[in-house]
Amino acid sequence: MAEAPLTRIERLALRFAEATNVDPRGKWLQTRFLRGISYLWVRAGLANRMLVEGLDGIMALRPETGVMLVSNHRSFFDQYAMLLACYMGPVHWSKRLFFPVRSNFFYDQPLGIVVNAVVAGGAMYPPIFRQAERRALNDAALDKMVELLQTPGNVLGMHPEGTRGKGPDPYEFLPAQPGVGKVALLGKPIVVPAFIHGLGNNIVQDIAWNLGSEARKSRAVITVFGPPVDYDDLMAEKPRPALYKKAADRFMLEVGKLRAREKELRAQVNSGELTDDDPRWLDNRPVGKLYAREGKP
């Protein structure tokens, strides 16, 4: 099957993404944007009602390679919750952030390019092309992710499910896709699982909820980070598609183990047992409000 050529919009989107993610100067500027601009609005729209457990645990890690954050996927804004947690920790190893996304919208629509630029400084990279005729582009994206994970300080935020769960039960997962397993087994990063619950898909409504007087009790966004996933036994095997799927399933299994703790925390919030002065509320962390400074080991 012949490779489908990129459209003019896709070429423009890729040039912008490479300028802000591959070029070191562009990545430096992007990081300043995320820490100085995105941080302001994400914090204003989320931090008041966001509770994070396990943050001090991941702050204590000393990665010698890149880190892959894997989480469930219910909201368009899940990755921003993880970004905010890393910046407000502050997590010292989260120096350069990358959020792989499907090419649909963000790379094939003018508005998608604008959203990626204005909201994330271009950090929604690399794009995943799912069409069969774009397989070579998809393979190149996977190779790029593997390459990124070789460098300490690089963090990839990924959803093993591949797409948002839209069912009525927020604790139910879609099947894990093998791509995330392939990237991990070839890149060999530290893999940190997280379970996130409480975000919606309407940014205006989410910000309004954050400003409400009962934001924490009625609309808490709870994130639970777990310890790094042990997958050494899988890395010892010969890479193959079945093994990629097995790795992805293991990552989602570890994410799933965090659901019970999230339910316990939510019950404590609703009952008043977990009070507003608890240090796990992000707004209670002693960090700057105007700029997210890098943490120290």
What role is predicted for each listed range?
Residues I37, V52-G57, C86-Y87, L142-K144, ...:
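A generic local structural motif
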Residues E3-E53, A81-L84, M88, H92, ...:
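A transmembrane-helix-recognition feature enriched in membrane-embedded lipid enzymes
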Residues A2-V22, G26, R135-P297:
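Non-catalytic C-terminal accessory region of glycerolipid acyltransferases
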Residues W41-H73:
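Helix-to-loop junction immediately C-terminal to a conserved catalytic motif
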Residues Q30, N72-S75, F173, Y244:
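Aromatic-acidic/polar surface patches that form glycan- and anion
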Residues L61-R134:
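Catalytic core of membrane glycerolipid acyltransferases/transacylases, capturing the structured
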Residues N48, W93-K95, R219-V221:
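Residue-level signal for beta-strand positions within conserved beta-sheet cores that form or flank
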Residues D56, H73, S103-F105, G162, ...:
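Short, flexible active-site-adjacent loop segments at beta-strand->alpha-helix junctions, enriched
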